[in-house]
Amino acid sequence: YADDVVEYFVQKSIANGIDIIRIFDCLNDIRNLQTAVTACNKEKGHAQVALSYTLGDAYTLDYWMEMAKRVEDMGADSLCIKDMAGLLVPAKATELVQALKDSTSLPVELHTHYTSGVASMTYMKAVEAGVDIIDTAMSPFALGTSQPATEVMVEAFKNTPYDTGLDLNLLSEIADYFRPLREEALASGLMNPKVLGVNINTLRYQVPGGMLSNLISQLKEQGKEDKYEEVLAEVPRVRKDLGEPPLVTPSSQIVGTQAVFNVLMGERYKVATKETKDILLGKYGQTVKPFNPEVVDKVLGEDKKNAITCRPADLLEPELDKIEAEMKQYKQQDEDVLSYALFPQVATDFFKYREAQQTGVDAKTADTKNGAYPV
C-alpha cells in the first residue's frame, strides 16, 4: 500500500480506540515498517514492532539483537517476537529473551503458537528469562494452531514471582460462554480437527499454523489431500529458493501456494504465481539471503532486469484520493475508504448489502438502465 493509505489506516485505528498498533513485515525489512511507526508516533499511539521469528543459519542471536536495536532506534514503543510457527523451543527462548533484554530497553512481548506442542514450556522459560508480556487465548480457542490457554498459564504462574493476579473463576465463566461456539465450528466443518492437535512437522518444515490450514484447504479444493506430506516437504525448498524469508503473511501464502503448484504440476516452477514473481523482483522488500539464481532465471527470464532494490513503497504514488473517488457513491464514513482500499470486492459487496438494508432496495435486482428499483 502507498504511504498515505498506511498513515490513514493508523490514524483511523487509533481514533477508533485501538491502543497498540502491532507492525510487522514478512521479510523483517525494517524499511517497510518506518511509515507505520512514524504515523503511530504522530497519533500518540503505542507502536509495537513485531519481528517474525524463524530458523536458518542467517537468523543468529546477533541478527535478532541487531534488529532489536534498529527497532528501538526507529521509534518503536515495544518489541514483539512473533513466533507464528511455534518454532521457538524453551531453551532457545531463554537465550533469545536474555539477548533481547541485553540489547534494548524496550518492553519485550512474545507471541507463539501451540502447533508444535512446546508453546507453554516456551512461555515458562521466556517469563523466567525476563519477557514482559505473553500472548494467550481463552481455552475454547486455544492449543493446536492457536496460543496456549490463558487459564492454564494463569494457574501455572500462581503463587510465583510472576503471578498475574487474574481470577481463574472469572476466566472460567468466559470460557464457558465461548465453548459452544467452538462446538458449533467443529460440527459445521468450519474448524478442521487437523489443526487442533500437535503437528511435529512444524519443527521439521517450519510451517505456521495458519499456513497449515491454508495448505489443507487448497489441497481439499483440488481433491489432492493425499499430497499433504509431499507439499509440506516442498515448502522449505521453496522458502530457500526465495531467500529464506520468515513464513508469515503474506510470504507464507506465497511460499505455500508455490509449493502446492510445484507438487501438483509435477515440475518445480512450471507455473509460478504472480506473487512468487513479485518477491523475486524485490517488490516485497529485501530478503535476508539471496534468491536461487536458477529459479530467478526460470521464473523471470528477461524480466529479471526489472528487479528493484529500493523500498517498494518508494515507487508507489499516493493513492488515497484515487481510492476515495472510486468508491465515493458508497461512502458513509471515513472508514469505508479504508475498507475499500484493503478489500475492494468484499467491501463493495458489503456496501451494497448495507444500502439494501437501509433503503429496502436490493441493488442486485434493480434495473438501473430504466430506473426501476423494486422494494
Question: Which sequence ranges carry the predicted segments?
Answer:
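Alpha/beta enzyme core
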Residues: 1-110, 123-131
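Acidic-enriched, low-complexity/disordered segments with a strong bias for Aspartate over Glutamate
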Residues: 3-4, 19, 25, 29, ...
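Terminal or standalone catalytic/regulatory effector modules within metabolic enzymes
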Residues: 192-202, 206-375
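Helix N-terminus capping/helix-initiation residues
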Residues: 2, 60, 149, 167, ...
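Short secondary-structure transition/capping segments
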Residues: 32-41, 66-75, 90-104, 124-134, ...
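Histidine (H) residue identity feature
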Residues: 46, 111-113, 353, 373
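Catalytic alpha/beta core domains of metabolic enzymes, predominantly
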Residues: 84-270
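Phenylalanine-focused residue identity feature
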Residues: 9, 24, 141, 157, ...
